[in-house]
């Protein structure tokens, strides 16, 4: 959608159609328009990604269902266990990986009387459940690396695709001309 809009109007506001990165592991992206605009313009910057979670009142546990792209379940579990051992997380009694066919899930059991919101804020501060993801759009153009913004990347990609289509058409035309030459004798 953004590529088509930029092709139609080179001055198109990219932020209006390209809202932000979409990570395979999911997570919640803190939307900072100025930082995102800087990344889109220069190809450098960072965004803050936070895990998605909910509170299971029946089991008195926090369920993390999406994690930042730059971390793993094991790293999160290890850091939580370290914090529990150091006495920094007295509200947490146990952490386990309940990932199955339904998807990712880290269950964090809370002690009675713990406030889930406050515990999650602590977890975001002390573990990889919240992380900064650095962007560096380093692209090879003509065999040389360049850092480019999104608009430049889209323009380079469009030019590359146009050249690919042109070369394919020239190749097909040559094959058809050779076949025509053989048929005509």
Q: Which residues are covered by each model-predicted region?
A:
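C-terminal interaction appendages of subunits in large macromolecular complexes
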Residues: 1-185
């Amino acid at each position: 959608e953004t590529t088509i809009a930029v092709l139609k109007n080179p001055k198109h506001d990219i932020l209006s159609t390209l809202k932000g990165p979409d990570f395979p592991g999911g997570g919640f992206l803190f939307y900072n328009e100025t930082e995102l605009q800087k990344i889109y313009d220069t190809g450098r910057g960072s965004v803050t990604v936070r895990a998605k979670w909910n509170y299971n009142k029946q089991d008195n546990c926090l369920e993390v269902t999406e994690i930042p792209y730059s971390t793993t379940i094991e790293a999160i579990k290890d850091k939580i266990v370290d914090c529990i051992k150091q006495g920094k997380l007295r509200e947490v009694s146990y952490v386990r990986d309940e990932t199955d066919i339904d998807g990712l899930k880290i269950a964090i059991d809370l002690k009675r009387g713990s406030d889930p919101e406050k515990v999650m804020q602590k977890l975001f501060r002390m573990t990889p459940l919240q992380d900064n993801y650095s962007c560096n759009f380093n692209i090879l153009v003509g065999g040389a690396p360049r850092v480019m913004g999104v608009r430049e990347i889209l323009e380079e990609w469009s030019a590359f695709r146009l050249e690919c289509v042109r070369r394919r058409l020239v190749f097909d035309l040559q094959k058809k001309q050779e076949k025509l030459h053989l048929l005509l004798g």
